[in-house]
């Protein structure tokens, strides 16, 4: 070949040569027709039946032992199969048959450490795409699926076990999940155990057989659902006395995780302090003395704060997250939706009467307030209030003294505070608060800095104003309002300048996430420790998010929506403090930038009434 395009002459009539009006001569691409010649008719066809029918035939061949090229020997059982099918379904078999292992050349392969019946079920699945997980096979099928790396079967087994969770078996399922590295099942079993602690403890058999480290994992959780710390102490002592000779030396280690300072003085002195096992151990006596000092010396309590003095915050089953307004598809929106963790669903609820972007949202007396914002053409000072029991918005709330968008809103001391924002003319440092009894807004001390796109949070009886923009550039400064003094005080700045960020209180610290600096949208996050007056970095979110909402729902920190610099987002991320990661957690019905978020506790019947 000399590199020139090949000339091809064809005739539409077999046997003819030469050129006529029906002949085609092309240079280059033999599939390309000259201009003016009609393209041949085409009809792509994809068979929906073919994959299923092919598998059915191959499965028949297997059952008749035809064209089988490998025999799996599992215990006393011989299973005939085709290497190509096994390799297509299982990375374990693919590595075995396509590599240099001895099994790649053997016609009989011995598989150890797998139950015979479980292997049969998994091979059947490879040929049929079907398996029935049930109580009688799940404990053998899951380990087998883990060995063969059949992720779908692992997920099916874990889903089955989730549905079987009960106070009488949750600890066994938890241990099973831990053994087989099923992280999601382990997490769900942990949550179930924490929420049903009293019933789990009363089931006795599994609880009493817990190893010390697992008992500590359970009772050290902030989310442990107990009426009082007495339940935790009684559970620990029952566990120790179940096998007193073996467990007596472990009592001091376990007792460290009982929050003795939260007990009543009467119970601490009369029951805990007088228990023979406690009295006979020096470390235990020290823990009791620490608790006594905390209870009897209230003026010293600020210096004695620690894990044992932190009140537990069990999961509130009825907490529901609301996403309100925002900017979507080039316009402000009035739509509102809610997320119910019980059903893991986002549902639309009644819309506001006005479209609102840059709206401030907070919850006061179990009612959701939407303050100010921008409707796409005007800045707003109007306020709406949502009642989740009736699924209705009302507009009979007094307006703020000035129009505000990109405003921060929070509740402190029974008042609704509106902080900063902009009115269309200037960036604001004005702060006012709403009294629901009087239906009236009153101005309080202004911030030292003008702030639009500011985030606010309430912690320890103070109102915090975090970041924002002064109208010229993003801010990293933070100030704190003391309602007793009616004064703002500057505190430690963030590590990053942020406007339109998300802010929430989580595990007694203020988290600030996302936003925008001088040049780009941010995925970074940081948190403020009021004890040390310091900000420290937190692992970044998976997406950049400006105009993001941040809220704590049933003990989970959730980042909602925003803008990544290219796309309006409807995705949600949840922060996992143990793994120090953010993970995606589904999405809303609407994309939302600059929407507000609020959390309301509803009774079970209220959360499903409409």
UniProtKB/Swiss-Prot annotation:
<dbReference type="GO" id="GO:0005802">
    <property type="term" value="C:trans-Golgi network"/>
</dbReference>
<dbReference type="InterPro" id="IPR011705">
    <property type="entry name" value="BACK"/>
</dbReference>
<feature type="region of interest" description="Disordered">
    <location>
        <begin position="1"/>
        <end position="37"/>
    </location>
</feature>
<feature type="repeat" description="Kelch 3">
    <location>
        <begin position="415"/>
        <end position="461"/>
    </location>
</feature>
<keyword id="KW-0813">Transport</keyword>
<keyword id="KW-0963">Cytoplasm</keyword>
<dbReference type="GO" id="GO:0005737">
    <property type="term" value="C:cytoplasm"/>
</dbReference>
<dbReference type="InterPro" id="IPR015915">
    <property type="entry name" value="Kelch-typ_b-propeller"/>
</dbReference>
<keyword id="KW-0880">Kelch repeat</keyword>
<dbReference type="GO" id="GO:0048471">
    <property type="term" value="C:perinuclear region of cytoplasm"/>
</dbReference>
<dbReference type="GO" id="GO:0031463">
    <property type="term" value="C:Cul3-RING ubiquitin ligase complex"/>
</dbReference>
<feature type="repeat" description="Kelch 1">
    <location>
        <begin position="320"/>
        <end position="366"/>
    </location>
</feature>
<feature type="repeat" description="Kelch 5">
    <location>
        <begin position="510"/>
        <end position="555"/>
    </location>
</feature>
<dbReference type="GO" id="GO:1990756">
    <property type="term" value="F:ubiquitin-like ligase-substrate adaptor activity"/>
</dbReference>
<comment type="function">
    <text>Substrate-specific adapter of a BCR (BTB-CUL3-RBX1) E3 ubiquitin-protein ligase complex involved in interferon response and anterograde Golgi to endosome transport. The BCR(KLHL20) E3 ubiquitin ligase complex mediates the ubiquitination of target proteins, leading to their degradation by the proteasome. It also specifically mediates 'Lys-33'-linked ubiquitination.</text>
</comment>
<protein>
    <recommendedName>
        <fullName>Kelch-like protein 20</fullName>
    </recommendedName>
</protein>
<dbReference type="InterPro" id="IPR006652">
    <property type="entry name" value="Kelch_1"/>
</dbReference>
<dbReference type="GO" id="GO:0019964">
    <property type="term" value="F:type II interferon binding"/>
</dbReference>
<dbReference type="InterPro" id="IPR011043">
    <property type="entry name" value="Gal_Oxase/kelch_b-propeller"/>
</dbReference>
<dbReference type="Pfam" id="PF24681">
    <property type="entry name" value="Kelch_KLHDC2_KLHL20_DRC7"/>
</dbReference>
<dbReference type="Pfam" id="PF01344">
    <property type="entry name" value="Kelch_1"/>
</dbReference>
<keyword id="KW-0677">Repeat</keyword>
<dbReference type="GO" id="GO:0005829">
    <property type="term" value="C:cytosol"/>
</dbReference>
<comment type="pathway">
    <text>Protein modification; protein ubiquitination.</text>
</comment>
<dbReference type="GO" id="GO:0043161">
    <property type="term" value="P:proteasome-mediated ubiquitin-dependent protein catabolic process"/>
</dbReference>
<dbReference type="InterPro" id="IPR000210">
    <property type="entry name" value="BTB/POZ_dom"/>
</dbReference>
<dbReference type="GO" id="GO:0016605">
    <property type="term" value="C:PML body"/>
</dbReference>
<dbReference type="GO" id="GO:0016567">
    <property type="term" value="P:protein ubiquitination"/>
</dbReference>
<feature type="domain" description="BTB">
    <location>
        <begin position="68"/>
        <end position="135"/>
    </location>
</feature>
<dbReference type="Pfam" id="PF00651">
    <property type="entry name" value="BTB"/>
</dbReference>
<feature type="domain" description="BACK">
    <location>
        <begin position="170"/>
        <end position="273"/>
    </location>
</feature>
<dbReference type="GO" id="GO:0006895">
    <property type="term" value="P:Golgi to endosome transport"/>
</dbReference>
<dbReference type="InterPro" id="IPR017096">
    <property type="entry name" value="BTB-kelch_protein"/>
</dbReference>
<feature type="repeat" description="Kelch 6">
    <location>
        <begin position="557"/>
        <end position="602"/>
    </location>
</feature>
<feature type="repeat" description="Kelch 4">
    <location>
        <begin position="463"/>
        <end position="508"/>
    </location>
</feature>
<dbReference type="InterPro" id="IPR011333">
    <property type="entry name" value="SKP1/BTB/POZ_sf"/>
</dbReference>
<feature type="repeat" description="Kelch 2">
    <location>
        <begin position="368"/>
        <end position="414"/>
    </location>
</feature>
<dbReference type="GO" id="GO:0015031">
    <property type="term" value="P:protein transport"/>
</dbReference>
<comment type="subunit">
    <text>Component of the BCR(KLHL20) E3 ubiquitin ligase complex, at least composed of CUL3, KLHL20 and RBX1.</text>
</comment>
<keyword id="KW-0539">Nucleus</keyword>
<keyword id="KW-0653">Protein transport</keyword>
<dbReference type="GO" id="GO:0043066">
    <property type="term" value="P:negative regulation of apoptotic process"/>
</dbReference>
């Amino acid at each position: 070949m000399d590199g020139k395009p090949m000339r091809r002459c064809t005739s539409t009539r077999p046997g003819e040569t030469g050129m006529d009006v029906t002949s085609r001569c092309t240079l280059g691409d033999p599939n390309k027709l000259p201009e003016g010649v009609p393209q041949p008719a085409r009809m792509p066809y994809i068979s929906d039946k073919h994959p299923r029918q092919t598998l059915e035939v191959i499965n028949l061949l297997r059952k008749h032992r035809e064209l089988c090229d490998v025999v799996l020997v599992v215990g006393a059982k011989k299973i005939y199969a085709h290497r190509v099918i096994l390799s297509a379904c299982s990375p374990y078999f693919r590595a075995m048959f396509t590599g240099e292992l001895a099994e790649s050349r053997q016609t009989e392969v011995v598989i150890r450490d797998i139950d015979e019946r479980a292997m049969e079920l998994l091979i059947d699945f490879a040929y049929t795409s079907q398996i029935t997980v049930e109580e009688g096979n799940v404990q053998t099928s899951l380990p087998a699926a883990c060995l063969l790396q059949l992720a779908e079967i692992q997920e099916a087994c874990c889903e089955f076990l989730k549905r079987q969770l009960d106070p009488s078996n949750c600890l066994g399922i938890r241990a099973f999940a831990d053994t087989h590295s099923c992280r999601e099942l382990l997490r769900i079993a942990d949550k179930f155990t924490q929420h049903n602690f009293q019933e789990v403890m009363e089931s006795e058999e599994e609880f009493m057989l817990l190893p010390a480290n697992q008992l500590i994992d359970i009772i050290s959780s902030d989310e442990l659902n107990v009426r009082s710390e007495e339940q935790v102490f009684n559970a620990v002592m029952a566990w120790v006395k179940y096998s007193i000779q073996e467990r007596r030396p472990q009592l001091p280690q376990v007792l460290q995780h009982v929050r003795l300072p939260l007990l009543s003085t009467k119970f601490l002195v009369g029951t805990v302090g007088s228990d023979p096992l406690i009295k006979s151990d020096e470390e235990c006596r020290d823990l009791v003395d620490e608790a006594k000092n905390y209870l009897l010396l209230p003026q010293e309590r600020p210096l004695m704060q620690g894990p044992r003095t932190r009140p537990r915050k069990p999961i509130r089953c009825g907490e529901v997250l609301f996403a309100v307004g925002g900017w979507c598809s080039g316009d402000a929106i009035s739509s509102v939706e809610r997320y119910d963790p019980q059903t893991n669903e986002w549902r639309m609820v009644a819309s506001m009467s006005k479209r609102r972007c840059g709206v401030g949202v907070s919850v006061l007396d179990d009612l959701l307030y939407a303050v100010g914002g921008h409707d796409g053409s005007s800045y707003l000072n109007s306020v709406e209030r949502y009642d989740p029991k009736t699924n209705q918005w009302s507009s009979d709330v007094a307006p703020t003294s000035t129009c505000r968008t990109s405003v921060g809103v929070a509740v402190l001391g029974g008042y609704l505070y509106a902080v900063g924002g902009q009115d269309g003319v200037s960036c604001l440092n004005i702060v006012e608060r709403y009294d629901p009894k009087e239906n009236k807004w009153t101005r309080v001390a202004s911030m030292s800095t003008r702030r639009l796109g500011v985030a606010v949070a309430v912690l320890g009886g103070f109102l915090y104003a975090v970041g924002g923009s002064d109208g010229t550039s993003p801010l990293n400064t933070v100030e704190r309002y003391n309602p007793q003094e009616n004064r703002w005080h500057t505190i430690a700045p963030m590590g990053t300048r942020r406007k339109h960020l998300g802010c929430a209180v989580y595990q007694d610290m203020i988290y600030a996430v996302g936003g925008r600096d001088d040049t780009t949208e941010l995925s970074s996050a940081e948190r403020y420790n009021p004890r040390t007056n310091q900000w420290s970095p937190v692992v970044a979110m998976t997406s950049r998010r400006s105009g993001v909402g941040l809220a704590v729902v049933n003990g989970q920190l959730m980042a909602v929506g925003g803008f990544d610099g290219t796309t309006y987002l409807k995705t949600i991320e949840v922060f996992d403090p143990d793994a120090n990661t953010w993970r995606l957690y589904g999405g809303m019905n609407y994309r939302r930038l600059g929407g507000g978020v609020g959390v309301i506790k509803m009774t079970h019947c209220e959360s499903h009434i409409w």
